[in-house]
Amino acid sequence: CIHAAGIPKGVVNILHGTGPVVGNELTVNPDVNKISFTGSTGVGKTIAKGAADTMKRVTLELGGKSPNIILDDADFADAIPKAIFAAYLNSGQACAAATRLLVPAKR
């Protein structure tokens, strides 16, 4: 999708691997100019500390999984599409992404 959109190779790079190995290398490597991370506060602190030595820019979205609570008297036809939109806004990459949906059991 990225290349089909006309974005040149190397502009966007997606790496898979464990945080202690790949994440650490990205954090301390001087060839990496910026890190954007969504996840726990503990990992965010580790990234910030490692990135400080190379003065790289860091964007952190830290926190937990936010619930979206729909009460029994809600208009479900209206609320459910909005809840799904909220969960996937910004591709779900936000500390406040409402990725848990709580509804009454009888609904």
Give the residues covered by each predicted segment.
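PLP-dependent aminotransferase-like
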Residues: 1-23
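A general structural signal for stabilizing positions within well-ordered secondary structure
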Residues: 3-6, 26, 49, 92
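Short, surface-exposed connector motifs at secondary-structure boundaries
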Residues: 6-9, 27-34
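Beta-loop-alpha module in the N-terminal Rossmann-like domain of NAD(P)-dependent dehydrogenases
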Residues: 19-25, 39-46
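Well-formed, non-transmembrane alpha-helical positions, independent of function
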Residues: 25-26, 82
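ALDH superfamily catalytic-core signature
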Residues: 34, 40-107
